[in-house]
């Protein structure tokens, strides 16, 4: 690899990020909790409208606590508007997917956009069919449970990506003034 190629690769890695994308979220507490996870993992949050609640919903703000000012937040009027600005690998998270989310590769230097569907209906069926090769599944027992909570799913997926990336940009160890373990 030439020096120029190495510099370009390193620049790409520095610019690469994980992004969480919510398609028409319906439950304010889920969105607030996801916002908090995004703030904790340095992941921008993208929301595709319409939402099932107003953006200033008290329940959403409470679930996100006081982390809203630490969050990079983007809104889109429709799915196509988001797709047109998506400059990275798109992953559709769905119970209908064949590929396991933990077997995908996220440590490749690209930006990764993880798209999660509505809590009640998921992602649009035609969109899923058109992009089936990008769909990832979290294994679960489908006989007993219809789906996993979207907030929990976001957390599992983002931390798997971060694990593969060596938790880049996150504190692996922190010293607390009042450490409960000492």
UniProtKB/Swiss-Prot annotation:
UniProt keyword terms in alphabetical order: Cytoplasm, Methyltransferase, S-adenosyl-L-methionine, Transferase, tRNA processing
Q: Which reaction does it catalyse?
A: cytidine(34) in tRNA + S-adenosyl-L-methionine = 2'-O-methylcytidine(34) in tRNA + S-adenosyl-L-homocysteine + H(+); 5-carboxymethylaminomethyluridine(34) in tRNA(Leu) + S-adenosyl-L-methionine = 5-carboxymethylaminomethyl-2'-O-methyluridine(34) in tRNA(Leu) + S-adenosyl-L-homocysteine + H(+)
Return the Pfam families for the record: SpoU_methylase
Q: Does the keyword Thylakoid apply?
A: no
Which GO molecular function terms does the record list? RNA binding; tRNA (5-carboxymethylaminomethyluridine(34)-2'-O)-methyltransferase activity; tRNA (cytidine(34)-2'-O)-methyltransferase activity
As for subcellular location, the record says:
Cytoplasm
Q: Which InterPro entries match?
A: Alpha/beta_knot_MTases, SpoU_MeTrfase, TrmL, tRNA_m1G_MTases_N
**Which EC number(s) does UniProt give?**
2.1.1.207
SUPFAM superfamilies according to UniProt: alpha/beta knot
Q: Name one GO biological process term.
A: wobble position ribose methylation
Annotated S-adenosyl-L-methionine binding lies at 93, 117, 138, 147
**Where is it chiefly localized?**
cytoplasm
Q: What class of enzyme is it?
A: transferase
- Single GO cellular component annotation? cytoplasm
Q: What does this protein do?
A: Could methylate the ribose at the nucleotide 34 wobble position in tRNA.
- Family stated for the protein in its record: Belongs to the class IV-like SAM-binding methyltransferase superfamily. RNA methyltransferase TrmH family. TrmL subfamily.
Protein name listed in UniProt: Putative tRNA (cytidine(34)-2'-O)-methyltransferase
**Native source species:** Streptococcus pyogenes serotype M28 (strain MGAS6180)
Lineage, opening ranks: Bacteria, Bacillati, Bacillota, Bacilli, Lactobacillales
